[in-house]
Amino acid sequence: IIEPSLKALASKFNCDKMICRKCYVRCPRRTPQRTCRVLTWIPQARLPPRATNCRKRKCGHTNHVRPKKKLK
């Protein structure tokens, strides 16, 4: 059982984020092959909750951001 204050603090740092749509699409998919090169994961831009633009240069600092999906 988690205290409500600790749960709010944890969700602030882990769940209350914005995700860049362009950076998220460009991430490679995980495939069941055994090569390490395929399984490398490029992190998408996880932005602060009030972000309006992405911080990454690869997507051109786009303003296509969405809220991170909530846990069930």
Curated annotation (Swiss-Prot):
The keyword ATP-binding does not apply. The keyword Cell cycle does not apply. GO terms for cellular component: ribonucleoprotein complex; ribosome. GO terms for biological process: translation. SMART domains: Ribosomal_L40e. This ribosomal protein is synthesized as a C-terminal extension protein (CEP) of ubiquitin. This is Large ribosomal subunit protein eL40.
